Amino acid sequence: MAVKERVGTVVSDKMEKTVVVAVETRFPHPIYQKTVSRTTRYKAHDEDNSCRVGDRVRITETRPMSRQKRWAIAEVLSHSPKAAAAEAKAEEANQ
């Protein structure tokens, strides 16, 4: 059986080792043929707490880790420009 994968954007990183990833699906309406977009939010396991809000990530389906968490971060595709600027600013303040 193939492993399910999704690509989405991190919308919340306030939990410990967990992020909320919004995945947008686009499809034509069956009758009117207008493109409809639906957003599904998945809770995903982030072992290193490396994801920030705005990051594009790939998630894969895993065993149940908690009541609502059944996905894990496979890789970070791109970091958010805001998060990168905030990290650089924090690094300058520490020096």
Curated annotation (Swiss-Prot):
Listed GO biological process terms: translation
InterPro entries membership: NA-bd_OB-fold, Ribosomal_uS17, Ribosomal_uS17_bact/chlr
SUPFAM superfamilies: Nucleic acid-binding proteins (SSF50249)
TM spans (from-to): none
Keyword Zinc-finger part of the UniProt annotation: no
Keywords noted in UniProt: Ribonucleoprotein, Ribosomal protein, RNA-binding, rRNA-binding
A GO cellular component annotation in the UniProt record: cytosolic small ribosomal subunit
Matching NCBIfam families: PRK05610.1, uS17_bact
PANTHER family, A to Z: 40S RIBOSOMAL PROTEIN S11 FAMILY MEMBER, SMALL RIBOSOMAL SUBUNIT PROTEIN US17M
Role of this protein: One of the primary rRNA binding proteins, it binds specifically to the 5'-end of 16S ribosomal RNA.
Subunit composition and interactions: Part of the 30S ribosomal subunit.
Protein name: Small ribosomal subunit protein uS17
Taxonomic classification: Bacteria, Bacillati, Cyanobacteriota, Cyanophyceae, Synechococcales
Designated gene of the protein: rpsQ
